[in-house]
Swiss-Prot record:
Name this protein carries in UniProt: Phospho-N-acetylmuramoyl-pentapeptide-transferase
Role of this protein: Catalyzes the initial step of the lipid cycle reactions in the biosynthesis of the cell wall peptidoglycan: transfers peptidoglycan precursor phospho-MurNAc-pentapeptide from UDP-MurNAc-pentapeptide onto the lipid carrier undecaprenyl phosphate, yielding undecaprenyl-pyrophosphoryl-MurNAc-pentapeptide, known as lipid I.
Biological source species: Clostridium perfringens (strain SM101 / Type A)
Molecular functions (GO terms): metal ion binding; phospho-N-acetylmuramoyl-pentapeptide-transferase activity; UDP-N-acetylmuramoyl-L-alanyl-D-glutamyl-meso-2,6-diaminopimelyl-D-alanyl-D-alanine:undecaprenyl-phosphate transferase activity
Annotated transmembrane regions: 12-32, 58-78, 84-104, 120-140, 151-171, 177-197, 200-220, 229-250, 303-323
Membrane topology: Multi-pass membrane protein
CDD domains: GT_MraY (cd06852)
Enzyme class: transferase
Enzyme Commission number(s) of this protein: 2.7.8.13
Signal peptide: none
Listed InterPro entries: Glycosyl_transferase_4 (IPR000715), PNAcMuramoyl-5peptid_Trfase (IPR003524), PNAcMuramoyl-5peptid_Trfase_CS (IPR018480)
Cofactor(s) required for function per UniProt: Mg(2+)
Length: 323
């Protein structure tokens, strides 16, 4: 009943509707502009051959749901709480790193923007600043799923949170490898976080979450197979920053292991693939991240996105049961 109550609250419904409408309006404006600026995606040659035909598809489309979410936030919440603003800073801050990465790829005309070292340094700097700023409001404790308890990280909180942000943002980035995949999964993740935020009394934070979910639903119209636009690192890092910060504010970073199970699986598949090849010279998967493995098995992009979304729904219910 609490879940239903949160979803029929007029403010929540309006936030979803407004962000959906704003993103739907921005899409047909921003996508042609990206075409005109020749902000086309460069495709990795070592990736699936079926993806080569996607070369030139506009990227940096994450600006659509970033702007839509920001506009909706300030329309619905004239004076957002500090917690909601911290989530917004994380959303925009990590998105800015992604924007720099995308811009360099476009300038270089190849799928190489910031080096992995440069990107990691920027992610750690932003996460360090945000965590230091946020912990004054949220403390240093985190909840343990299923155990109904907390653990206080004390002095380890800030360094642990910094690497947590780097991990989550990179995980969402890895998930953004198929048309509509990261978008579909993150709609579900942000909806879950919005419901929990509402039920815990964080109304401004809940509005941020559902505004992002509504904007992503609209973006999915342009990003689903065959994609008319890609979110780029601009979008994927922004999404990672948003879900990571909201979960941290709620003292539930560990819950992302459940609701973000696809992010976890995608990341583990890459780690296992690299480790196996270096240690044995053999690959576990036909290609990593794992969504490409299923492509190589003959699954369509639409089927993979559907199955991964269903898995996310199942694990969201498991996460509800753990609270």
């Amino acid at each position: 009943m609490e879940i239903l109550k949160s979803m029929i609250d007029p403010k929540i419904v309006m936030a979803i509707v407004i962000s959906f409408i704003v993103a739907s309006i921005l899409g047909p404006i921003i996508i042609p502009l990206l075409h005109k600026l020749k902000f086309g995606q460069n495709i990795r040659q070592e990736g699936p051959k079926s993806h080569l035909k996607k070369a030139g598809t506009p990227t940096i489309g994450g600006l659509i749901f970033i702007f839509a979410t920001i506009i909706t936030m300030f329309v619905m919440v004239g004076n957002p709480t500090d917690e909601a603003m911290i989530a917004l800073y994380s959303f925009v801050g990590f998105g800015f790193v992604g924007f720099l990465d995308d811009l360099l790829k476009i300038i270089k005309k190849k799928n190489e923007g910031l080096t992995s070292g440069q990107k990691m340094i920027l992610l750690l700097i932003i996460s360090g600043f945000l965590t230091w700023y946020a912990y004054k409001y949220i403390g240093t404790s985190i909840n343990i799923p299923f155990l109904n308890g907390q653990i206080n990280l004390g002095l380890f909180y800030i360094p642990a949170a910094m690497f947590y942000f780097a991990g989550v943002t990179n995980a969402v980035n890895l998930t953004d490898g198929l048309d509509g995949l990261a978008t579909s999964v993150t709609v579900l993740v942000t909806t879950f976080l919005g419901i929990i935020s509402y039920n815990l009394g964080h109304i401004s934070l809940a509005i941020f979450c559902v505004a992002l979910a509504g904007a992503l639903l609209a973006f999915l119209r342009f990003n689903a197979f065959p994609a008319r636009v890609f979110m780029g690192d601009t979008g994927s890092l922004a999404l990672g920053g948003a879900v990571a910060m909201v979960a941290l504010i709620l003292k539930m970073p560990l819950i992302l292991v459940l609701i973000g199970i696809i992010y976890v699986i995608e990341t583990l598949s890459v780690i296992l693939q690299v480790a196996s090849f270096k240690l044995t010279g053999k690959r576990i998967f036909k290609m990593a991240p794992i969504h490409h493995h299923f492509e190589q098995l003959g699954w369509s992009e639409t089927k993979i996105v559907s199955v991964f979304s269903i898995i996310t729904v199942v694990f969201c219910f498991i996460a509800f049961a753990s609270l």
